Swiss-Prot record:
Positions bound to [4Fe-4S] cluster: C29, C54, C114
EC annotation from Swiss-Prot or TrEMBL: 1.3.7.7
Protein name: Light-independent protochlorophyllide reductase subunit N
Record's GO cellular component terms: chloroplast
Single annotated GO MF: oxidoreductase activity, acting on iron-sulfur proteins as donors
Protein family per UniProt: Belongs to the BchN/ChlN family.
NCBIfam families: DPOR_bchN, PRK02842.1
PANTHER family, per database record: LIGHT-INDEPENDENT PROTOCHLOROPHYLLIDE REDUCTASE SUBUNIT N (PTHR39429:SF3)
Primary gene name: chlN
Co-factor(s): [4Fe-4S] cluster
């Protein structure tokens, strides 16, 4: 592996380099979003409409047996469905009535798959009619394998659910205040006992564990900002009200479709901010929200310094090391920015799909971070070709490769340290306090490699 890297002085005019290949994708199917969304939305039921292959994938990927009675199920398509010999509406009605009788959820989410796309099942046409008959809302989301990354399944579901949010009725006085928000000095408030400041409504979107939701909400409350709701909420009946006067901000970089729906369909105003991953990203996320809502942020610099001090045990392990992102879950840009701030060199940042408008603030912060740390700008490759990537890995010899599960073992067999990118999807990585979990995941293969080197040098006696 490469030794400590000393980078030359970087030209301040240097910018990020973007490339696009036509690579193949080794990633999970987007219907895997069911695994975390059915737990997040507690009164929901997810019905995946697909073939036996979809059922096998969900059974193996989620690891939940039928005896556990999870709040999701498979509606398996048979040959008669594909050849149009069966009435799709009657079959779906029978299943939904059974779901209502057994579970009585507040909402049923139909997840379309590749097969429903190919045979042109009119799920959107059947859902409203069936919804009135059974008396339960039905949300249709086509989270199929035609997307670029498996995390975009959540994006599809949230975009469909955003259309079901109630409309917020704005008053004339509120509209005037929104057009010219006044900067509110937040320095005189006394911690949690302070009253919430007057500001436009704010809704955050992105599925996070309840503990992380509470932490991010509390961080904004400390600045005097009230969060009017989250999309998705823990219960479908508690969806936030949306409208022209509402500001929205995302917490994940793979929610560009949801952001577009909120702006176009619900007329919300999007706060384009970096994502709250790492101390630097969390601070920038809070500061951008405060600036847009007209609140002067306080105490964030000291808060960030304390978090960096708590990471001192991890930073020496990553400082000067190199990392290569093959691209899997669309979190690559945010993780590359945070690891660059930690002192790592990012050779390449592969990403399955990049919405430059939605991730504009994140890309700008990555560029600024590289200039401040005096390191080369990473090469950002959209839709990377794995064959060419492996050639570049052999040439660059990075200390760590963050890749999907399909490519991890072959790379390990060639003596390359790898980390499963899917672990960052399911770990709690958002907010100030969870920065340690990110570095714990990154340093684990590095520490394992160091232990192997030590054991080979000191514990094995040379043959006489």
């Amino acid at each position: 592996m490469s030794q400590l890297i000393t980078s030359p002085k970087i030209n301040e005019k240097e910018t990020l380099k973007f490339e696009c290949e036509t690579g193949n994708y080794h990633t999970f199917c987007p219907i895997s979003c069911v695994s975390w969304l059915y737990q997040k939305i507690e009164d929901s039921f997810f019905l995946v409409i697909g073939t036996k292959t979809c059922g096998y994938f969900l059974q193996n990927a989620l690891g939940v047996m039928i005896f556990a009675e999870p709040r999701y199920a498979m509606a398996e398509l048979e040959e008669a469905d594909i050849s149009a010999q069966l009435n799709d509406y009657k079959e779906l009605k029978r299943l939904c009535l059974q779901i209502k009788r057994d579970r009585n959820p507040s909402v049923i989410v139909w997840i379309g798959t590749c097969t429903t796309e190919i045979i042109k099942m009119d799920l959107e046409g059947m859902a409203p009619r069936l919804e009135t008959e059974i008396g339960i809302p039905i949300v249709v989301a086509r989270a199929n394998g035609l997307d670029y990354a498996f995390t975009q399944g959540e994006d599809t579901v949230l975009a469909a659910m955003a259309c079901r949010c109630p409309d917020k009725i704005s008053t004339t006085s509120d509209s005037k205040n929104l057009e010219t928000p006044m900067m509110i000095d937040n320095t005189q408030k006394n911690g949690q006992n302070s009253k919430a400041l007057a500001h436009p409504p704010l809704v955050l979107f992105g599925s996070l564990p309840s503990a992380v939701v509470n932490v991010l909400t509390l961080e904004l409350n400390k600045q005097g900002i009230t969060v009017d709701g989250w999309l998705p909420s823990s219960r479908y009946t508690d969806l936030p009200a949306l409208g022209e006067d509402v500001y929205v901000c995302g917490v994940n970089p793979f929610l560009s479709r949801t952001a577009m729906t909120l702006m176009r369909r619900k007329k919300c105003k999007l706060i384009n901010a970096p994502f709250p991953i790492g101390p630097d990203g969390t601070r920038a996320w809070i500061e951008k929200i405060c600036n847009v809502l007209g609140v002067i942020p306080t105490g964030l610099e000291e808060r960030e310094k304390k978090i960096w001090q708590s990471l001192e045990n991890y930073l020496p392990l990553v400082r000067g090391k190199s990392v290569f992102f093959m691209g899997d879950n669309l979190l690559e840009i945010s993780l590359a920015r945070f690891l660059t701030r930690c002192g790592m060199i990012v050779y390449e940042c592969g990403v399955p799909y990049l919405d430059k408008r939605y991730q504009a603030s994140e890309l700008l912060l990555l560029e600024q971070t590289c200039l401040e740390k005096n390191v080369p700008m990473p090469r950002i490759v959209e839709k990377p070709d794995n064959y060419y990537q492996i050639q570049r890995i052999r040439e660059l010899q990075p200390d760590l490769v963050i890749t999907g599960m399909a490519l991890s073992n072959p790379l390990e067999a060639r003596g390359i340290n790898t980390k499963w990118s899917v672990e960052f999807t399911f770990a709690q990585i958002h907010g100030f306090a969870n920065s340690k979990d990110v570095l714990e995941l990154v340093t684990r293969p590095l520490r394992r490699n160091m232990m192997q080197q030590v054991s080979n040098k000191t514990l094995v006696k040379p043959a006489k």
